[in-house]
Amino acid sequence: MHRFLEATAGQYMTRKVKTVARDTTMRELHKMFEADDFNCYPVREGDDIVGVVSHFDFLKCFAFNPVRMVPAYDDLLSRMVADVMTPEFIYVDPATKLTRVLQLMVDHRMKSVPVLDAEHRLAGIIAREDIMRALTDSARG
């Protein structure tokens, strides 16, 4: 267990991360979610990460109350990621201990957390599966 206590996000994160642009359509995002086994994508504007978009953000587009008219499906899929993304997002840096990452995931019910370097550039992403791998590695000693 001691190994897990010392492990960092940088040691277990996925370094090659797929991102989406702010002007990606919901239709394109839907195809990406179908093709990949990801819960969320960092949203980029140039080299900067300006938010995240998750399955939950995508699904919120389709939640309506009886007072609102339901827009056409094609109209919803034509919306841009910028319209539904979460611009205020939680992230960690590569030196963040996995114990802290795990606590953030539990507290905020997150499946993955972007990892940004000192210049706030995307360094990777760490998912629940990465935490599980670290725990398994630690148990093996």
Residue ranges of predicted features:
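Tandem CBS (Bateman) regulatory domains
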Residues: M1-K16, S54-I90, K97, L102-V106, ...
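A short helix-to-beta-strand capping loop
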Residues: T14, D37-F38
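Short, flexible active-site loop motifs that bind/organize anionic cofactors or intermediates
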Residues: K16-T19, D48, Y91, R121
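The conserved cystathionine-beta-synthase
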Residues: V20-D37, V43-R44, Y91-R109, L116, ...
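Short active-site-adjacent helix-start/loop capping segments
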Residues: E28, I49-V50, C61
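A glycine-centered beta-loop-beta connector
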Residues: F33, Y41-D57, M105, V113-D130
